[in-house]
């Protein structure tokens, strides 16, 4: 197994977390000890990299050769996966494709660790998908951020206003005094967060990731 649990055969330990990368050490049987970093934010991303390395070793690749190949970091570009799109000035901005409660939890925790100021979250929920997870997503978003901006994603054939209301009501129930805004067009929602944020703050645009389209009634 590869995890961070005490009884695992392989362990991923985080050695550094910055807005630009996460450094880790992978320790395993027979003294295997591999150090590297991923150009992604979050311990969960380092754990994914560790699992990939374990799979290579279990497939017969030499651990020392793997270490030599990735000693200076793993070169990867994954659009929309805690992707940092920060400009030269202003707040840190991250785009993440995750659209589940677990994804929200991990990504918000990662952003919080590297943010000195407030954490803004701009998010919505897809239409014609599992509606039962929407209240939980909104609860996690509310508990993990300082300012929420609820917007539309891909409403498909659902009423986007109804989706937003479900998210808004669940967020208010979780944290009644939280600063929450409802802005339907995603472009306007992002602009709202940028206008409110200050240097030292961070904005997480969660859900559609790198997608540059919207699915509205097909």
Kindly label every feature range from the protein language model.
Residues 1-5:
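Short beta-strand elements of ligand-binding domains
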């Amino acid at each position: 197994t590869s995890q961070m649990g005490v009884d695992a055969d392989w362990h991923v330990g985080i050695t550094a977390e910055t807005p630009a990368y996460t450094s880790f050490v992978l320790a395993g049987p027979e003294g295997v000890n591999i150090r590297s970093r991923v150009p992604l934010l979050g311990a969960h991303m380092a754990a994914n990299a560790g699992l990939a390395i374990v799979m290579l070793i279990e497939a017969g690749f030499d651990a020392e050769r793997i270490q030599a190949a990735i000693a200076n970091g793993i070169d990867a570009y994954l659009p929309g996966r805690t992707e940092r799109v920060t400009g030269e000035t202003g707040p840190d901005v991250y785009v993440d494709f995750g659209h589940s409660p677990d994804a929200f939890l991990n990504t918000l925790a990662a952003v919080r660790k590297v943010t000195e100021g407030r954490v803004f979250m701009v998010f919505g929920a897809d239409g014609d998908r599992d509606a039962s997870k929407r209240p939980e997503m909104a609860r996690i978003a509310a508990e993990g951020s300082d300012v929420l901006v609820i917007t539309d994603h891909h409403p498909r054939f659902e009423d986007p206003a109804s989706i937003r209301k479900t998210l808004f009501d669940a967020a208010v129930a979780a944290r009644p005094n939280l600063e929450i805004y409802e802005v339907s067009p995603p472009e306007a929602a992002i602009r709202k967060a940028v206008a409110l944020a200050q240097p030292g703050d961070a904005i997480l645009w969660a859900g559609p990731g790198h997608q540059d389209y919207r699915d509205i009634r097909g």
